[in-house]
Amino acid sequence: HDHRSGFNSTILKGTLRNILYKIDGEDPESKYRLEYGECKEGSERVIVQDNVVFKETCRFDNIEGTSYYMDHDVLHKIELMTPSVITHMVRDELVKQAPNFIIDTSKPFKCAFSEPKTDKECWEIIEYTINLSN
C-alpha cells in the first residue's frame, strides 16, 4: 500500500521493518492487482491495473528511538521485528483522497481498518503493549 499523505514516523518501542516496492510492468499470469480506494468496510476500490508485477526496491529496519520519512506515493509494507511496536506518526497535508493497494487476487482482501476498535479496546492494547517487556 501507499498513503494519502507523506509522514514522519518515530519508533517509540520495538523494531519495525519497512519493505519498499515498485510496480515493474505486468504479466497475464500475475495474480496481483493495483487498486485505489478507501480502506473501510463496504467501500469500493477502483482497479488501477490488473496483472501487475512488482519488485522489492529496498528494506530497512528502524529501532526504538529512530525516525523515518515515507512519501505518499511509496508502496511499502511493514513487518514487526519485535513482539510489539509503538510508533508516533505525524502526517503531512493530504495529497490524495485514498491510498493504493497491491491486492493478491487469490486471497480475500481484509483491510486493517475495516473493523475499528472501541476506545476501550485501543487502551487495553496500548496498556498490554507497553507492559509486554516490563
Q: What is each residue range found by the language model?
A:
Residues 4-18, 22:
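Short, conserved beta-strand element in jelly-roll/cupin
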